[in-house]
A protein has these predicted regions:
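Alpha-helical subdomain
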Residues: 1-74, 171, 176-342
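Conserved Class I S-adenosyl-L-methionine-dependent methyltransferase catalytic core
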Residues: 4, 10-32, 36-42, 50-51, ...
Length: 342
């Protein structure tokens, strides 16, 4: 079954989904005196984390969100209050919204999760470490029931982006593509529909491979898309592909782990091989965009990673031995960062 590109992109649905995190992030920050501290003096995320004894990673993630919400601005690496925050979020202001916001905050489960993440006490909305979605991949095992849930979740918010990417990004010259952590296989499906000569491999954990086969079969592409049961951290990667593809994979992991994955991609490619990274990119300014900054907060709560700027991905790729780095907007809030193996 061939799927057509939707007539409008899915940004409004992304906005709707992620808006549920905005107020809880603000109320958690109010409770932890983030805005009061910045009223005293502008600060980098490292300085603010030290001043308030907060998690540096969590602070780095939430400050761009507050900038995108118009509550902070960033100058010379330091964040400072906007007029809106100074008027309406400080306890000493006659216009303080605290009477409403402080009452509303505890009613949201996201408030507690974000507060605890900022304090460095909790890394997941789902409970203790071990319950995060990325932990199954870190452990190298996922049960078939969990694989079905994860695949459905990922497929639902990725299929439109996959179809758009297949239309808008240049994959010319690619004959065999390895989709690292390919989930339901929606990106391979979209690319195979678009490029008749392309053959793809979905590299996943065994249970995810079984689920991906169902999606591929339903699309009528089992003759050109195969699966490979490989633990991306512990096993060697296939070396018979001329391109590697990562979608929403690197944002699950810290920088050393991302460097390790890109090094494995480099080792598995011949010179001239290509890598494609599909992510929603943060602005280099540290002020959003709003939906991507909120998505980064979701990564804080459910993974070990966060969203990247283009410059950060370009450096990771360069350090791994890739060259000719560039980026192309692909669909909705997404872009594809591409590079070539030396």
């Amino acid at each position: 079954m061939t799927m057509d590109l939707p007539t409008t992109d899915d940004r409004p649905v992304w906005d709707l989904w992620l808006s549920m995190y905005h107020a809880p992030a603000v109320t958690a920050a109010i409770e932890l005196d983030v805005f009061e501290a910045l009223a005293t003096a502008p600060a980098t995320h490292e300085e603010l984390a030290r001043r308030l004894k907060l998690s540096e990673r969590a602070t780095e993630i939430v400050l761009p969100l507050f900038a995108a919400l118009g509550l902070l601005s960033r100058y010379d690496g330091r964040y400072q209050l906007s007029d809106v925050a100074r008027l309406y979020l400080l306890r000493g202001s006659p216009y303080d919204w605290g009477g409403l916001l402080n009452r509303m905050g505890p009613s949201s489960p996201h408030h507690a999760a974000i507060r605890e993440a900022l304090k460095g006490e909790r890394a997941s909305t789902t409970g203790a470490p071990g319950d995060r979605p990325s932990d199954a991949w870190a452990a190298g095992h996922v049960e078939i029931e969990q694989a079905r849930v994860i695949a459905a979740f990922m497929h639902s918010h990725s299929i439109a982006a996959a179809l758009g990417m297949a239309r808008n990004v240049d994959f010319s010259g690619v004959r065999r593509l390895l989709d690292v952590g390919g989930g339901s296989g929606c990106f391979c499906i979209a690319l195979a529909q678009r490029i008749p000569q392309l053959r793809c491999t979905i590299m996943e954990l065994p249970a995810m491979c079984e689920v991906a086969k169902e999606y591929v079969s339903a699309a009528g592409l089992a003759d050109r898309i195969e699966t490979g049961a490989v633990d991306m951290f512990r096993q060697e990667w296939p070396r018979d592909h001329d391109a590697m593809f990562f979608s929403n994979i690197l944002h699950d992991w810290d920088f050393p782990t991302c460097a390790r994955l890109l090094a494995k991609a480099h080792a598995a490619l011949a010179p001239g091989g290509r890598v494609f990274i599909h992510e929603s990119l943060l602005d280099d300014s540290g002020a959003g965009p709003l939906t991507t900054a909120t998505f980064s907060l979701v990564m804080l709560l459910g993974t070990q990673g966060r969203q990247f700027t283009y410059a950060e991905l370009a450096k990771l790729l360069g350090d791994a031995g890739f060259t000719d780095v560039g980026a192309t907007p692909s669909y909705g809030y997404y872009s594809v960062v591409r590079a070539t193996r030396r």
